[in-house]
């Protein structure tokens, strides 16, 4: 738990530093020559987590990239995972056994990719192809030991304050979403889908919901981030590595509220429910648009 406290302290300090830096940026009193906002450096820093009675999975994801224009860009990054199993107490008859808290931490797979965007008042589209290298530990469940490939597409359109969206993709591993940090890493062909909408409640405040599905094709191999020591009955709870055809099949839903006090950072808090794995979780995502901050400084 001491390590967990240090981890949270580091994440909060990093978030605070970015917010302070944004607050120190001076707004010019006179119009300036505008730098092309569609071209230049991009970068995101996110701290997200999923917490339930079975486990606590956290991820810090850092990436940098470059947009060549409003339609095409490239990026690269690396995630750092922190998986914690809380201590448990089991009573059998007159005997009580206690199991201490266990922790896994380390980097995941380094990734790079490109993004294609087609903004439009009628329908916004963005598609990304991401390739990852097996730099994470397979024994800790942070990698499958094989290269990963993901192709994701997102469509959305805003109707005043309401923004419906659809996201779908093909991959050889089940990806984390912006609101769900998974307790395992998988190897095997899957399709991943998410449909939902977000509504602006007031200035800076939003609420949203979505449903998601993961559909596997053929054999799946699952590497547990819990080292097979989870309290549940799912494959990633009971075994460090498991193989089967439907191990990654899943459907569920997310609900969230979001606070966006400035354009460079956003905090989401919510609830996620996996119907397939029978897991109800608290989830959060703190995201900082470092690239936008750097671009804004170039305008002054």
Model-derived segments and their meaning:
Residues 55-60, 86-94, 127, 137-145, ...:
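Outer-membrane beta-barrel translocator domains and adjoining extracellular loop/strand segments
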Residues 47-51, 78-84, 118, 131-137, ...:
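Transmembrane beta-strands of outer-membrane beta-barrel pores
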Residues 29-45, 70-72, 121-125, 160-166, ...:
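Outer-envelope beta-barrel architecture signal
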Residues 40, 144-238:
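Detector for outer-membrane/organellar transmembrane beta-barrel domains
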Residues 87-100, 192, 196-300:
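Outer membrane beta-barrel transmembrane domains
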Residues 56-60, 101-110, 143-149, 185-193, ...:
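Residues that define the transmembrane beta-barrel architecture of outer-membrane proteins
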Residues 21-54, 156, 226, 244, ...:
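Outer-membrane beta-barrel biogenesis signature
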Residues 43-45, 76, 114, 127-129, ...:
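Membrane-embedded beta-strand positions of outer-membrane beta-barrel proteins
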